[in-house]
């Protein structure tokens, strides 16, 4: 068994399942904290199932109990270890499916994607939410672009492959343009703060 402790949850990886339990926050009022953890856990499970119905490979949710989700374990390789233009193109296709279903993943990075049996599985929907607006979709895409830039020398080719897949699957050109605008905003802030 492997145990990972993140800012929001403890994740136990067992032989066939993954058990994700949201951690209580001591700084919150106890009743409020419990309510938030229950609501967020239920919402995450609902979003995982909605993503799966939209045609995006995700772990199957097996059980939801209070602040804990039990889901299928996906065996495969982290996308960060097998990244290629084809893989990034497929990530773009799946991101478009999420967005067309009104789902914002919130953390599309190679660490939260698993390649298994030639399919890209999206995992860790802890920051996900439902929204149909261009801005959060643009942020979703921007997060992926930034993760590519931080991890891969050929990030521009990987970004372009993602865009190809995203648009081919019916993703909006406006979302891609918004992701580019968000990047420019960041550059402007950097120049102003340095300057």
Curated annotation (Swiss-Prot):
One of its GO terms (cellular component) is cytosol. ATP binds at residue 12. It is found in: Cytoplasm. One of its GO terms (molecular function) is protein serine kinase activity. It is an enzyme of class 2 (transferase). The keyword Protein biosynthesis does not apply. Residues 1-195 form the Protein kinase domain. Pfam families: RIO1 (PF01163). The keyword ATP-binding applies. The active site is at residue 107. Gene3D superfamilies: Phosphorylase Kinase, domain 1, Transferase(Phosphotransferase) domain 1. Its EC number is 2.7.11.1. It comes from the Archaea. One of its GO terms (biological process) is tRNA processing. It catalyses: L-seryl-[protein] + ATP = O-phospho-L-seryl-[protein] + ADP + H(+); L-threonyl-[protein] + ATP = O-phospho-L-threonyl-[protein] + ADP + H(+). Keywords: ATP-binding, Cytoplasm, Kinase, Nucleotide-binding, Serine/threonine-protein kinase, Transferase, tRNA processing. PANTHER family: EKC_KEOPS COMPLEX SUBUNIT TP53RK, NON-SPECIFIC SERINE/THREONINE PROTEIN KINASE. NCBIfam families: arch_bud32, PRK14879.1-3. Could be involved in the formation of a threonylcarbamoyl group on adenosine at position 37 (t(6)A37) in tRNAs that read codons beginning with adenine. Belongs to the protein kinase superfamily. Tyr protein kinase family. BUD32 subfamily. This is Probable serine/threonine-protein kinase BUD32 homolog. It comes from Archaeoglobus fulgidus (strain ATCC 49558 / DSM 4304 / JCM 9628 / NBRC 100126 / VC-16).
């Amino acid at each position: 068994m492997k145990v990972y402790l993140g800012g929001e949850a403890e994740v136990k990886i067992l032989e066939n399942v993954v058990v994700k339990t949201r951690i209580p926050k001591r700084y919150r009022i106890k009743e409020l904290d419990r309510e938030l953890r229950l609501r967020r856990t239920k919402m995450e499970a609902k979003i995982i199932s909605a993503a799966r119905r939209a045609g995006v490979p995700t772990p199957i949710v097996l059980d939801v109990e209070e602040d804990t989700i039990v889901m299928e374990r996906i065996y495969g390789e982290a996308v960060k270890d097998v990244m290629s233009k084809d893989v990034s193109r497929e990530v773009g296709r799946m991101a478009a499916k999420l967005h067309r279903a009104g789902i914002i993943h919130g953390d599309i990075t190679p660490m939260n994607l698993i390649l298994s049996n030639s399919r890209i599985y999206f995992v860790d929907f802890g920051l996900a939410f439902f929204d149909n607006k261009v801005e959060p979709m643009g942020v979703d895409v921007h997060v992926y672009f930034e993760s590519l830039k931080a991890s891969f020398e050929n990030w521009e080719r990987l970004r372009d492959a993602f865009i190809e897949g995203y648009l081919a699957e019916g993703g909006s050109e406006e979302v891609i343009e918004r992701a580019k605008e968000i990047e420019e905003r960041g550059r402007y802030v950097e120049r102003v703060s340095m300057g």
